[in-house]
Amino acid sequence: MENELVIKPRYTLSEELMSAISHGIGVLLAIAGMVLCIVKSASDGSAVGVVSSSLYGSFMIILYLMSTLYHSFKPNITAKKVFRIFDHCSIFLLIFGTYVPYTLVTLHGALGWTLFGIVLGAAVLGIVLNSINLEKYKKMSMICYLVMGWAIIGAIKQIYNNLDFNGVLLLVLGGIIYTIGAVLYG
């Protein structure tokens, strides 16, 4: 029974240290990025943009903070196990947060709110499953990650019509990077 509580170290001490440091830097950069996005949205006079930027930035900060804390604890202590769950759940938050500006600012209307609801639902499902058992629902989590990441395809025409070329390019590159990350993780 005691062996069930033991988690084998997944990373060396130096890997953990580098992850904690780099993700800690990510927290600081996420704060700076969030401030820039909020200032830009406010200068555009967009209340929805300010809210969207705030949500996106907050979820990015949460992701990097949970990862920093996860990598900061020694293996086989309760805090590490708890922050591992938080770390995985925060991925769903960030993917959802990434959609908020696209769904509420770029798309808005019925299509935007529909996509918002679909991605939010998938995020909630993923968070619930990860909170129950990370290993048991790993494949389902992967499916949720990929569905969330590529759900925007259903609105690609409207996205293309409402964003400039660079915006569409960044969206596509972001989707590819999310997918590579999901495949490497899985």
Locations of the language-model features?
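Multi-pass alpha-helical transmembrane bundles in non-GPCR membrane proteins
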Residues: M1-G186
